A protein has these predicted regions:
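Intrinsically disordered, low-complexity, charge-rich terminal extensions
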Residues: 1-154, 159-368
Length: 368
């Protein structure tokens, strides 16, 4: 699956591209020089763009400009999957190599590395088209890193949360299954088996209380969901028109609250009472030591109705200044600090899922 490329654009698009401020004067000189044309720095950019756009152009011109003007994707949320200990490391490595070969054959660039700490890293560089942008800015340069980390229970596969990475993840798991003699069960973090809206909310409130040594400071954003109940009417039953309820077709599925002390707000608790549950949350936490920085985290179920595709991201940290004050600008965490934090978040999420599942089972037994 090659992620589309541009092969031709209009003269107007070329004119606009050469007038774009992202294109430096030196790059303008280079593109003219590639045609054997020398230009003066005194010539106006608009005149140069008008002249060049009238020339005959080829793919290399479009590729040169789209590489400069194309956008780069933002950091994406991560999602993880557990691979059991019955799978051998050499089978995982072989599956990763086979996936790399397949991706490269599709026209993208993929490479597998065994890191010093034992992690298996699969890096994919590819391009996507965003047709909402102007022609020479439609190319989005993307990079997806699939990490397979050895764990006490086997391996943890961590991938970005997007459609392309999900396809590669499924391909990798399929190849691991093919390399293994026995049936392999891959486990993801999910609340699909729990329908109680209170327990779904409890998953998040318990999750964020403490991640490793990081204790909850405040929730800044809470997103809640209320699935629409499917109602079916049996036409064989006679109904009294006077007693029939009127459905006005009004149903609010999603709501969000932002600010300070969101979890304690009356507005959120009133939504709980109506059957809403949390599906996405952004919060800040810190270690108890004096002078610790504030960490901002986000966790969500990408499919809020079924509570599947659990994903998360360490958004960064606010550096401690002095006397209880913190910087206003958020700073990106180092690779090692982020990895350690995400591992702790994953472990806490799985632990919380087990506790919530046990609680749901006990409540079910009481009802029986």
């Amino acid at each position: 699956m090659k992620m589309g490329h541009l092969y031709s654009v209009s003269d107007k698009a070329l004119f606009d591209a050469l007038n774009n401020s992202k294109l430096t004067n030196q790059e303008i000189i280079d593109i003219f020089f590639s045609r054997g044309i020398l230009i003066s720095k005194e010539t106006k950019r608009k005149d140069l763009a008008l002249y060049f756009s009238r020339l005959t152009h080829g793919f290399h011109d479009f590729e040169f400009l789209s590489e400069i003007l194309g956008t780069y994707s933002r950091k994406e949320k991560s999602t993880s999957c557990e691979i059991p200990s019955t799978v051998k490391k050499e089978d995982v490595i072989q599956a990763a190599h086979e996936l790399c070969q397949k991706i490269n054959q599709e026209g993208n660039t993929a490479d597998t590395n065994i890191l010093p700490n034992g992690d298996i890293e699969l890096v994919v560089k590819y391009k996507k088209l965003n047709l909402d942008k102007s022609e020479l800015r439609q190319t989005v340069n993307k990079e997806a890193t699939l990490i397979i980390e050895p764990s006490k229970t086997g391996f943890t596969l961590r991938t970005p949360l997007n459609e392309d990475a999900n396809i590669w993840k499924e391909d990798l798991l399929q190849k691991i299954q093919e390399e293994t003699d026995t049936e392999v069960e891959f486990t993801e973090i999910s609340l699909e088996h729990i329908s109680d809206h209170k327990l779904r909310t409890e998953f998040f409130t318990e999750l964020i209380k403490k991640i490793g040594n990081y204790e909850l400071l405040d929730v800044t954003d809470a997103y809640v969901y209320h699935p629409k109940e499917s109602t079916s009417v049996d036409s064989d039953f006679d109904r009294d028109d006077d007693d029939e309820e009127v459905d006005f077709g009004i149903h609010i599925s999603k709501a969000s609250l932002k600010g300070e002390g969101v979890l304690q707000s009356e507005e959120l608790h009133s939504l709980y009472a109506k059957g809403f549950y949390i599906w996405r949350v952004i919060w800040r936490c810190k270690e108890p030591a004096v002078g610790s920085d504030q960490i901002e985290l986000e966790a969500q179920f990408a499919e809020p109705e079924s509570c599947t595709e659990f994903s998360y991201i360490a958004k960064g940290f606010y550096k401690y200044k002095n006397q209880g004050t913190y910087s206003k600008n958020r700073t990106t965490l180092s690779y090692s600090a982020e990895k350690d934090l995400l591992q702790k978040l994953e472990n806490k999420a799985r632990e919380t899922i087990r506790e919530i599942s046990q609680k749901a089972a006990e409540e079910g037994n009481e009802e029986d």
